C-alpha cells in the first residue's frame, strides 16, 4: 500500500539504467549527463561500478574521475580501465595516487604486478608482489608469487 503524499524518487542514474534496459542509448546518454550533475557521489559510484561491469568504460571513467577525491580507491578502477584501453602508463599513473598509508595499497601493488607481468617485466612484478606480502598475507598474493616464481623457474 502506497502512502499518500510520498513520491518515490527515481534518480537520473536509475533512469539511465532503465533507458539502457530499453536499448535507448540516446536517452541513456541524456540521463547519464544529468546524473553527473544531480546524483550523489554514492549513487554515481554504484552507477560507475555497474557501467564498468557491462563494458561502458568511457562513462564509468568519467564518473570515477568526478568522484576520485571522495573515493580515492576508484584509482584502482581507473587503472583497470586504462589498462583495458591499452594505456599502461596512464594505468600506472592512477596506481601511483594510492599511497602506502591507504587501505587500497595492497590492491594497487597487486594490480601493478599484473601490469608489469603483462609488459614482460616478470622480475618487477615479483618485487611488487613481495612488497604487497609485507602488508598482507592474502593467499591470492602467495599464489600469484608462486605462479611468477614458476614462470621465472624459481623453484
List where the protein language model places each region.
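Start-of-helix register in tetratricopeptide repeats
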Residues: 10, 42, 73-76, 107, ...
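Register position in tetratricopeptide repeats
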Residues: 21, 53-54, 84-85, 118-119, ...
Amino acid at each position: 500500500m502506497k502512502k499518500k503524499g510520498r513520491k518515490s524518487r527515481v534518480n537520473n542514474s536509475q533512469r539511465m539504467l532503465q533507458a539502457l534496459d530499453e536499448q535507448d542509448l540516446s536517452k541513456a546518454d541524456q540521463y547519464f549527463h544529468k546524473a553527473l550533475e544531480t546524483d550523489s557521489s554514492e549513487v554515481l559510484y554504484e552507477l560507475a561500478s555497474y557501467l564498468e561491469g557491462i563494458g561502458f568504460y568511457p562513462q564509468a571513467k568519467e564518473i570515477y574521475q568526478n568522484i576520485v577525491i571522495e573515493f580515492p580507491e576508484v584509482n584502482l578502477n581507473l587503472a583497470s580501465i586504462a589498462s583495458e584501453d591499452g594505456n599502461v602508463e596512464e594505468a600506472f599513473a592512477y596506481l601511483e595516487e594510492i599511497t602506502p598509508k591507504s587501505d587500497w595499497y595492497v590492491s594497487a601493488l597487486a594490480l601493478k604486478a599484473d601490469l608489469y607481468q603483462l609488459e614482460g617485466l616478470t622480475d618487477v612484478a615479483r618485487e611488487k608482489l613481495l612488497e604487497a606480502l609485507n602488508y598482507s598475507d592474502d593467499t591470492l598474493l602467495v599464489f600469484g608469487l608462486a605462479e611468477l616464481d614458476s614462470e621465472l623457474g624459481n623453484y
